[in-house]
Amino acid sequence: MNEHTSNPIIEMSGVSKWFGDFQVLKEVDLQVFSGERVVVCGPSGSGKSTLIRCLNRLEEHQEGRIVVDGIELDQDTQHINKVRSEVGMVFQQFNLFPHLTVLENCTLGPMKVRGLSKKDAEALAMEYLQRVRIPEQAAKYPGSLSGGQQQRVAIARSLCMQPRIMLFDEPTSALDPEMIKEVLDVMIDLAESGMTMICVTHEMGFARTVAHQMVFMDEGRIIESSPPAQFFSEPEHERTQLFLSQILSH
């Protein structure tokens, strides 16, 4: 994906953010085009999670511009709500409602926000639960599911809002090792469907498989951005080389 005839679906220009006196993002520039999959990696505290949380205004940037699907994220509440309706997000923790069944977790948003009838919302939810390979869990409560199953419910719940963009913030980091593959397999299926995705992850095998663009962050800056073949075989920056040597040796 080196040539693009359309405008980017996500554009960050000179984005900076502080937590108090600590600058967590430093003049970040990033473009993502429709259908692209971008993997963001880097050491702990490099600003990865803050970067993607700014894309649906879970965090507010102080300088620069963020435009998502043609809408600038500014102080306008209508703009923020419109972007949030286009952007799904999956976190480290599953954030499912424990008192609702799997099906109810998935239908709540479409009914409350998108105005779907219960019948239509349930049909949509079952379609996505099938897609993440757990339709048989629909009547169960989250507490009875494994971590991998709960994370797949969280992915299905986001997809039920029919977003144009999906953000993943280290979705496998809270899982037991044997459950990681089942979640990554679902994410690979989603990538192959053409969904625009930005994933913060250290799952480098997944990154090699699905990413169009690798982004490496350190100390609040994007240090390197390149296609996976180049990123893994010929990283330009010494800091990237050190990071990869450490993470790929495990």
Where are these regions (language model features)?
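ABC family nucleotide-binding domain
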Residues: 7-228
